[in-house]
A protein has these predicted regions:
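Short beta-strand micro-motifs in enzyme catalytic cores
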Residues: 61, 79, 115-119
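A short core secondary-structure module
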Residues: 66-103
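Active-site glycine-rich loop that binds ribose-phosphate moieties when present
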Residues: 45-48, 97-108, 113
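A structural detector for beta-sheet-dominated domains
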Residues: 55-57, 96, 122
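Glycine-rich flavin
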Residues: 1-76
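Glycine-rich beta->alpha junctions and the first turn(s) of the following alpha-helix
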Residues: 109-196
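Short, acidic/polar N-cap/turn motifs at the starts of alpha helices
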Residues: 51-52, 90, 116
Length: 196
């Protein structure tokens, strides 16, 4: 992630996002995890809810709502929509990207390439097998699944920030050492002080 971020922070950001979200497979029923990850190119994105109306029924769930800041959504195949049910339990809905509307509201100066659009659905029927409790009912025993999700996000995003800082310092040093003046001499080797 550090090396990728040194070339393109937006790409690294999206990779980190999908990698962390993929660890949710450890909380899914096996059939849902298989449905998503049998495709080796599966990419997941999510975002915090702006609004939602989720009606859980016996065999399926009727979903309407809008979620934002979904980094990498143009490349994603599955969207993780977070909601709180009537019992105040946080749950995740796995929605195929083909069912949502993308809304390009990502007007920023930095990390524009993450394409962190919002997405919305209106009265979409989702099978109940696509819904699972958020961070409950861990089904895998590997140590990575015991690390809190927010810590995984934080360590990835801080790696990106450190890589950007390192790349910026290296660029400034290289620029200072190797910039050439009007007469093709390195400015660092000239005897007079120049200011631009």
């Amino acid at each position: 992630l550090f090396e990728i971020a040194s070339k393109d922070a937006s790409v690294a950001w999206c990779i980190n996002q999908s990698n962390v979200l993929s660890t949710n497979a450890a909380f899914m029923e096996k059939d849902l995890a298989k449905k998503i990850f049998d495709d080796p190119s599966a990419i997941i994105t999510n975002g915090p809810p702006l609004e939602y109306d989720v009606k859980e029924r016996e065999s399926d769930t009727l979903v309407s709502g809008k979620w934002s800041f979904s980094s990498g959504i143009k490349h994603a195949s599955w969207l993780l929509a977070i909601f709180t049910d009537e019992n105040k339990q946080n749950k995740n809905i796995m929605i195929p990207k083909s069912l949502v509307q993308l809304n390009d509201v990502w007007d920023v100066s930095g990390l524009r390439g993450t394409g962190s659009y919002s997405f919305s659905v209106k009265n979409k029927v989702i099978p109940n097998e696509n819904i699972f409790f958020d961070r409950l009912n861990l089904k895998e025993s590997g140590p990575i699944y015991k690390i809190p999700r927010d810590l995984k996000f934080g360590s990835g995003f801080s790696t990106i920030a450190l890589s950007l800082a390192n790349s910026s310092i290296n660029y400034a040093l290289d620029f200072a050492k190797n910039k050439k003046g009007v007469f093709s001499e390195k400015l660092s080797e000239e005897q007079i002080f120049l200011r631009e």
